[in-house]
Curated annotation (Swiss-Prot):
Subcellular locations according to the entry: Cytoplasm
Gene Ontology biological-process annotations: tRNA methylation; tRNA wobble uridine modification
Membrane spanning stretches: none
Top EC class of this enzyme: transferase
GO MF annotations in UniProt: flavin adenine dinucleotide binding; tRNA (uracil(54)-C5)-methyltransferase activity, 5,10-methylenetetrahydrofolate-dependent
Family per similarity comment: Belongs to the MnmG family. TrmFO subfamily.
Residues where FAD binds: G11, A12, G13, L14, A15, G16
Catalytic activity, EC: 2.1.1.74
This protein's record includes keyword Ligase: no
Cofactor(s) listed in the protein's UniProt record: FAD
Name of this protein: Methylenetetrahydrofolate--tRNA-(uracil-5-)-methyltransferase TrmFO
Species this protein is from: Prochlorococcus marinus (strain MIT 9211)
Length: 474
């Protein structure tokens, strides 16, 4: 197989795996480059594709939530990765969380066994030739050599921020005499383990977090202390203020241990309710592994063990994985990309995933779907798909590719990653004050326009006699 007969995809993370599958589903050969395990990254632990290095959650399931809406759009588009996430989901209240080992193993097995996908376990150090259709989905941990070549190609200094992952605890080591099962506001089943704290416990815990020794940054990381606001280390939250954690990952609202008594009794509620609550979310289907929700950290491992064992119920916690922090690299996309995810200066070069400046697992999958589908369309000589801004996938890709959609003050500042959120969608034509109803209206409009845009493109494809386009769900 000649390289000219195939599409090159760099990186087998969430975006790269999705892109590879969409290209192959269109009947086109793929050369998929993945440097692991030949060259390790600072955050990955395995050689599997689509390894989840931070949380195991893809966010809210409900389509009237931003991440849930993007998931629903991807289900309609028959996303390979979201289908696998649904297949390997674990209980998580109203969220889509997965058994990360089974999920990644499933993705890896399906891709490596696909007859149209050739996997190359080598580091691609330079961009392929201009004639080669290529999707760069190398992720936020892009290797130094490729990042340098991208910087030379774009002529723009790389952007980066620090990201971190939470520790994982062995379930059998959690003491349920001090913790309880339950979901916030009793949504779904009792899918979380909750560790309540009184005020004295919380303040002592915060003090020790602030005093705890952090892991030393690598030389290339010391020049910056930028954090992505959606994934701040817990010790950074502790430093920001006495109540910051209580209004963030440790918020106690909506959580009640039945052993405390009648929730409807005002006196009991006032006396017993927790001052703060640490939540643990199930990592695997069997419930043997639990991650500390929102506890991304860069503390030294010994300090993690010492401080986190102050949490009620975790006095004897067995740490299966400690938290880590690493630097994430991304492109200054508004200066470089179109909403089709093509580079403006090279139409056959596309980018997808977190390297484009979208944040979160579902956004990475969406970018992979769009870049892979558009790469296939380019190979067949057709125009790429650009989704309307009223869809979540379209809103995100327009937002990262158009400076005009950012406020004047934001345009003056450096580009920062953007997760799925309703703020990037255009306003509704009618004002709806009630939040849930407003979000439901965004959802309905987005799904209607997504389906219409796909129908229109499919009709065009049928008119032109193209039978190899990906099959969409009706």
């Amino acid at each position: 197989m000649n390289q000219s007969d195939s599409i090159t995809i760099v990186g087998a993370g969430l975006a790269g795996s999705e892109a590879a599958w969409q290209v192959a589903r269109a009947g086109i050969h793929v050369e998929l480059y993945e440097m692991r395990p030949l060259k390790a990254s600072p955050a990955h632990h395995t050689a599997d594709f689509a390894e989840l290095v931070c949380s195991n959650s893809f966010g809210a399931l409900s389509a009237d939530r931003a991440a849930g809406l993007l998931q629903e759009e991807l289900r309609y588009l028959n996303s390979f990765v979201i289908n696998s996430a649904d297949k390997h989901s674990v209980p998580a209240g109203g969220a889509l969380a997965v058994d990360r080992s089974r999920f990644s193993a499933d993705i890896t097995e399906k891709i490596t066994s696909h007859p149209l996908i050739t996997v190359k376990r080598v580091e691609l150090q330079k961009l392929p030739s201009e004639e080669q259709i290529t999707v760069i989905a190398s992720g936020p941990l892009t290797s130094k050599n490729l990042a340098e070549d991208l910087k030379n190609f774009t002529g723009i200094q790389e952007c980066h921020f620090f990201d971190a992952a939470s520790p994982i605890i062995a379930g059998e080591s959690i003491d349920l005499r001090f913790a309880f099962r339950g979901s916030r506001y009793d949504k779904g089943d009792a899918d979380y383990i909750n560790c309540p704290m009184n005020k004295k416990q919380y303040l002592s815990f915060r003090d020790e977090l602030i005093k705890a020794e952090q892991a030393e940054l690598k030389d290339f990381e010391k020049s910056s202390s930028n954090f992505f606001e959606g994934c701040l280390p817990i010790e950074e939250l502790a430093r920001r203020g006495e109540d910051t954690m209580r209004y963030g990952p440790l918020k106690p609202i909506g959580l009640w241990d039945p052993r405390w008594g009648d929730l409807n009794n005002r006196e009991i509620r006032r006396e017993k309710r927790a001052y703060a609550v640490v939540q643990l979310r199930q990592e695997d289907r069997e419930g043997k592994l639990w991650n500390l929700v929102g506890f991304q950290t860069n503390l030294k491992w010994g300090e993690q063990k010492r401080v986190l064992r102050m949490i009620p119920g975790l006095q004897n916690a067995d740490f299966v994985r400690f938290g880590v922090m690493h630097r994430n690299t991304f492109l200054e996309s508004p200066k470089l990309l179109n909403a089709s995810l093509q580079f403006r200066k090279r139409a056959k070069l596309l980018a997808a995933g977190q390297i484009t400046g979208t944040e979160g697992y579902v956004a990475a999958v969406a970018g992979g779907w769009l870049a892979g589908t558009n790469a296939a369309l380019l190979a067949m000589g057709h125009k790429p798909i650009i989704f309307p801004r009223n869809t979540m996938i379209g809103a995100l890709t327009h937002f990262i590719s158009d400076w005009e959609l950012r406020s004047d003050s934001n345009r003056k500042n450096s580009f920062q990653p953007m997760p799925p959120n309703f703020g990037v969608l255009p306003k509704l034509t009618t004002q709806i004050k009630e939040k849930r109803a407003r979000y439901a209206a965004y959802r309905d409009r987005a799904l209607d326009e997504l389906k219409a845009s796909i129908r229109n493109h499919t009709c065009l494809a049928q008119e032109l006699g193209i039978s190899k386009l990906p099959i969409y769900r009706s």
